[in-house]
Amino acid sequence: MLKNQDLDIERKQEHIEINLTKNIESTLKSGFESIQFIHNALPEINYDNIDTTTTFLGKALQAPILISSMTGGTARARDINYRLAEAAQKAGIAMGLGSMRVLLAAADTIKTFAVRHIAPDILLLANIGAVQLNYGVTPKECQYLVDATKADALILHLNVLQELTQPEGNRNWANLLPKIREVINYLSVPVIVKEVGYGLSKQVAKSLIDVGVKTLDIAGSGGTSWSQVEAYRAKNSLQNRIASSFINWGIPTLDSLKMVREISKNVSIIASGGLKSGIDGAKAIRMGANIFGLAGQLLKAVDNSEYLVSEEIQLIIKQLKITMLCTGSRTLKDLTKAEIKL
């Protein structure tokens, strides 16, 4: 029988392959397609003076972009993370690491997550599933993940539906809020709570804010459907049918963004889930996000070369800057007031 860490590594290998080769898109849309910017034909701004810089979690970013968490723990994942880190360093944007539970069981997997030597200046986010706090992971171990990778913050991801569509997934989701509070109080860095593609509701966001969470990654539906990923991993027809039945589950990203921003003007929001371009990112900023995250198209590019992922990031940044010029927005603050049609 495979040990837990071997199962983790096998699952990560399968996840990469499925994400690269299968259609695992949610049937729901992110919602950003319903927003239209009002074109400004005379912006009276020099394109070269467009300013996409921002500060997030105390780090300066050249653009409000996060390479969302993808992978780790395998040789292929190491290559992917190294290329992503190099691209993030070049562009001056943030990067999230994939789930790091395997590192707590297999110390040698650190080489697949350790990218700080490649990207000394980026905002780097360590990552582990929040549910692992119910399965023995301690605040001290969470701090270890941060220290081992020299990360600037820790993501606790919420992946309840994904876990329940895995035959080996974790089932106990009770009493996590007090444990999340403990991690927040223990860690030397900020804690981000993130969904993985089904969105954060108003009620969940309020509960998290009430225990001290100051940064949320809403990760709504409209992009990768992890139940579809698990459907491809299913070992029998029953598992496949259970996972496949949730392809249209979740809160579209735009709806989640509106819900969370409605209950708090102060919480920092990362908008991710189904964003495909810098235009979508601009819409997310306009609707209240501080920064936006992308993963799917970057994974497909980075599996081939660092050059291709850097090119994809430059495309996204140029789309954002052109959108800003064509809405008369010289800065990201200006963009939050751009005229739109819903």
UniProtKB/Swiss-Prot annotation:
Binding residue positions for FMN: S68, S69, M70, T71, S99, N127, K194, T224, G274, L275, K276, A295, G296
Keyword terms of this UniProt record: Cytoplasm, Flavoprotein, FMN, Isomerase, Isoprene biosynthesis, Magnesium, Metal-binding, NADP
Main location: cytoplasm
UniProt: Mg(2+) binding residues: E163
GO BP annotation list: isoprenoid biosynthetic process
GO molecular function (one): isopentenyl-diphosphate delta-isomerase activity
Family, as annotated: Belongs to the IPP isomerase type 2 family.
Identification of the protein by name: Isopentenyl-diphosphate delta-isomerase
Annotated organism of origin: Rickettsia canadensis (strain McKiel)
